[in-house]
Amino acid sequence: IVPSNELAMNLALIGHGKMGQQVERCALELGHSIQMIANGQWDSASLKRVDLTIEFSRPEAAFENVTKCLRAGVAVVCGTTGWNDKIPAAEKLCKELGGSFLFASNFSIGVNLLFALNKWLAERMDGQAGFAPELEEIHHEHKLDAPSGTAIRLAEDLIQAVDRIGQWK
């Protein structure tokens, strides 16, 4: 599917690791234009012609990247994990500025179905004799964040659904 010229977007990519490179390939195949690629320090003036920023950088950089984009009036889709404690502040700034900000720890349809199933099962199993939820995460050796954002989300959803679980470790 290739968008018509009126649907094509001018994109900025912040973070050009494996995921950023995949996003770039897909965006170009779909007819979008990459206006900026940043893999470190960047200037908000480079967002002048950008409709949307896609951010897959590092946890220590994500908050600054997202807030710079929002202050520049550019919508942000962020998939960087590991900065959960600062996401509420980014959401607050977004609301104050009337901006657009979407965060997800995982964009896979299958994993998002897993999130829903995890919550649904935990709610129904809570209180059942012998129900003792346990998570174990296994990744390839090049995985940068551990635990992953996906594992954290699964654990947080279990904590919300199961009364006797107060925290994860």
Tell what function each PLM region has.
Residues 53-55, 76-79, 103-104:
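Short catalytic-loop micro-motif centered on adjacent basic/acidic residues
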Residues 36-50:
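Short acidic low-complexity segments
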Residues 48-71, 82-87:
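Beta-loop-alpha module in the N-terminal Rossmann-like domain of NAD(P)-dependent dehydrogenases
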Residues 72-75, 97-99:
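A short helix->loop->beta-strand "cap" motif at the edges of active sites that frequently abuts
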Residues 67, 80-102, 109-123:
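Rossmann-fold NAD(P)-binding glycine/threonine-rich loop
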Residues 1-8:
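Short, Lys/Arg-enriched N-terminal segments with co-localized hydrophobic residues
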Residues 9-26, 30, 48, 123-169:
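Active-site-lining helix/loop region of Rossmann-like oxidoreductase modules
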